[in-house]
Amino acid sequence: MAEKIATREAYGKALAALADKYPDLVCFDADLAGATMTKFFKAACPERFFDMGIAEADMVGVAAGMSLCGFKPFVNTFAMFAAGRAWEQVRNSVAYPHLNVKVVGSHGGLSVGEDGATHQCIEDFAIMRAIPGMLVLCPCDGNEMRLAVEALVNYEGPAYMRLGRLAVETVTDSIPGYKFELGKGATLRDGTDVTIIAVGMNVQMALAAADLLAADGISARVIDMHTIKPLDRELVLKAAKETSAIVTTEEANVLGGLGAAVAEYLGETYPIPVVRHGVNDEFGRSGKAPLVLDAYGINADGIVAKAKQAIAMKK
């Protein structure tokens, strides 16, 4: 049976496991170590763990300063505060001088659940993607997260990574030939009729949707686009040419995120039907995470409907 683990937990354990290997790695949190799972790094390496309290903007500024001293800071808080409250400091103190700071936003998307709209950050992909030079990613499972963390430690420059609250099935470790590389998507399943490009926990939904489509005689390709920026344009173009219809799916506002990135690129280079699946420009609501996701159609059935819509739009 596949491992089921929240990407936030996989992240916290992976970061802690790298503490000895990378003595310049430092970890910041804003009084949320138990939720963001940086508690594992704190336990493993307390002298390089800094709890800044509920002062996210200050935390980013201090991390920027430490990066100038040769350290590799990972800054942690909820996605709403990382992409929202501290956005100006991320833009001006980290991205503008192109400093080597990694901003990690946990509890992203609708699946925060009961905390409701004020904490359901569905805008972080768009907000962070708009910052020049900012790498933006959201791994889909524990295996991919572990690989992403070390890749980020060795990546020089500013980056934003979203983590999820819910435990999700590990799927990438059973894909033949799977490998992780920043800026490069991974084809998890081949298909000829439509391509589903997914990010984060929507990858698992996309694989389930592909099974449902197969039952209807539709061959769906599934791409795990863990890195939203820079977008793997080569892989997107290949899928566009070979399947002639694309669905993007994300646990985020469809404005400015993965769907926008794919549509912008293909609109200028190889126009085909692109249908975006995600939150349609509205706030979230409070409730059990699975119920909230279903209320917004963020599930396999929602992806199936969008895939059939994209196929119907083919010329």
Which ranges hold each PLM region?
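Thiamine diphosphate
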Residues: 1-162, 167, 302, ...
